[in-house]
């Protein structure tokens, strides 16, 4: 079944959510319920596109499908945080980006129809690995943004960019929820890798596995700092940045290291 129709519908709804929130932001209205509901509807439609795409492709994820799933996860975190904290302005960027991923996934047809379907455990490992990478990278980005926001709030007058950002406590809540989600998804990815991937500790994957475990510890230490001291501390932000850097090296830099260093 073609993904084009549901993909276009999801993309339209998500772009409408971003545009609606942008209009509300220009009016000085931080919260817009219509934008929020459009974001929720778009998130559900994007996940439906992923499920349908995986079914059509024998359970094998494509880059477009995994990008859509990652975008939906980040959108879900923003939407969940928006229920209690004024971070709706982030929908201006997150919703359209998720829509673009969904559009790409719906336009690019599956390429592995001739291959045997993946078993459920391997498919879960692949999906959670991609989600973990995105969530950890997102938490590291938020940690950098929070550190910059902390520094700039001490300066007067405030710059337009700082004034446009959500309040500090709302950003910290979003960061905390992102770290919790990243740690949980990374835990599932490592668990399924250890028990269901035969060559998980093989030499060609050992460096990725070690860096992923170190990133897991980084996220765990960041959460431990929160529960021990409360709030979002400087050490928590730095630890999240280190964890994100380690996982980025594991996923993006490993090939370059193997080819040019080793």
Residue spans of the language-model regions?
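Alpha-helical transmembrane segments
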Residues: 10, 123-142
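Cytoplasmic-side transmembrane-helix entry/capping segments in multi-pass membrane proteins
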Residues: 30-40, 62-68, 87-99, 236-242
């Amino acid at each position: 079944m073609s993904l084009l129709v549901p993909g276009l519908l999801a993309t339209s709804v998500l772009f409408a959510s971003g545009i609606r929130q942008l209009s509300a932001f220009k009016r000085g209205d931080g919260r817009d319920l219509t934008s929020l509901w459009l974001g929720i509807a778009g998130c559900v439609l994007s996940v439906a596109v992923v499920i349908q795409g995986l079914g059509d492709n024998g359970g094998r994820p494509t880059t477009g499908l995994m990008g859509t799933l990652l975008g939906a996860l980040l959108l879900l975190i923003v939407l969940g945080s928006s229920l209690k904290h004024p971070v709706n302005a982030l929908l201006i960027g997150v919703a359209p980006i998720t829509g673009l991923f969904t559009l790409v996934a719906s336009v690019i047809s599956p390429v592995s129809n001739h291959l045997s379907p993946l078993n459920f455990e391997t498919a879960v490992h692949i999906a959670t690995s991609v989600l973990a990478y995105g969530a950890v990278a997102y938490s590291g980005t938020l940690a950098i943004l929070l550190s910059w926001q902390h520094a700039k709030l001490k300066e007067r007058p405030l710059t337009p960019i700082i004034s446009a950002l959500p309040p500090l406590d709302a950003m910290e809540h979003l960061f905390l929820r992102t770290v919790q989600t990243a740690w949980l998804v990374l835990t599932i990815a490592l668990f399924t890798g250890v028990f269901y991937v035969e060559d998980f500790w093989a030499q060609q994957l050992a460096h990725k596995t070690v860096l992923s475990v170190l990133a897991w510890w980084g996220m765990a230490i960041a959460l431990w700092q929160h529960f021990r001291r409360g709030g979002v501390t400087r050490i928590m932000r730095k630890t999240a940045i280190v964890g994100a850097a380690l996982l980025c090296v594991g996923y993006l830099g490993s090939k370059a290291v193997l080819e040019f260093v080793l």
